[in-house]
Amino acid sequence: MAPKQDPKPKFQEGERVLCFHGPLLYEAKCVKVAIKDKQVKYFIHHSGWNKNWDEWVPESRVLKYVDTNLQKQRELQKANQEQYAEGKMRGAAPGKKTSGLQQKNVDVKTKKNKQKTPGNGDGGSTSETPQPPRKKRARVDPTVENEETFMNRVEVKVKIPEELKPWLVDDWDLITRQKQLFYLPAKKNVDSILEDYANYKKSRGNTDNKEYAVNEVVAGIKEYFNVMLGTQLLYKFERPQYAEILADHPDAPMSQVYGAPHLLRLFVRIGAMLAYTPLDEKSLALLLNYLHDFLKYLAKNSATLFSASDYEVAPPEYHRKAV
């Protein structure tokens, strides 16, 4: 009996594709193709992303760049935004004060390996047999790390401090119900907030290693913000404003334009993205401790970072664009 032949790849090196990262589809490029254990895998570069996020993915996470799949991409973005708004209203109650900052802020748990397909909204792929992580360092060859993430997916949950939840609700209410817009460019933009935080940490006499880690975390938050803002962090009513910003500032990172409310929205969504980073569970928990510390900083400075006076009523002509 002739040996079973290797499967034929559906995508070629250099091909423009759509690829799942978390629950959403992103434009990407197939850089390499490999067949291992009768399974086709692709080394993917997400368009516009730093090369640090290049990763090996199974064929189930890659789709052809055609109109039907582009429509699916738009539908997933819309569904994700609606789920985001609903989740915030359920989880954030104004006026409720608890010792949320003293509670454990990070919930990292390994998913039981269930075979899911991107069509079911999972966007990931797992193997039938789970294996414990074997990595001892946070930074290893990205090819090796991303191969292992197929075997061991980590679910990440970042809890928002209770002091900040009312601001999420107020932000939602001002925009979706009162039809106001956050004034742009922000008086204090995301870059400035992150720089202030880094300087604050340095002033507390951190070691060189901790200072380096803070700089890395700040750079990571900034990159996530710039990547996710246009697809996951805006309400429908804000989209015409976003289009105007892109037209007026085509080369400006959005972290130089938007401010604290949109940065806070990032932390509601960032857990789903962190599940696909090339980090082992221990390194991910360490990263989340840094994110928790940054959220504590936002809570401590919330009186100066968040204000209803930073919003303005949208003019009538804007309403016509937003319909």
From Swiss-Prot:
Start and end residues of each stretch annotated as Sufficient for interaction with PHF12: 149-303
Region entry Interaction with RB1-1, spans: 125-191
InterPro entries (UniProt xref): Chromo-like_dom_sf (IPR016197), Chromo/chromo_shadow_dom (IPR000953), MRG (IPR008676), MRG_C_sf (IPR038217), MRG_dom (IPR026541), MSL3_chromo-like (IPR053820)
SMART domains noted in UniProt: CHROMO
Tudor-knot domain sequence ranges: 12-62
Domain of life of the organism encoding this protein: Eukaryota
UniProt main location, coarse: nucleus
Function (record text): Component of the NuA4 histone acetyltransferase (HAT) complex which is involved in transcriptional activation of select genes principally by acetylation of nucleosomal histones H4 and H2A. This modification may both alter nucleosome - DNA interactions and promote interaction of the modified histones with other proteins which positively regulate transcription.
Protein name, as recorded: Mortality factor 4-like protein 1
Record organism: Pongo abelii
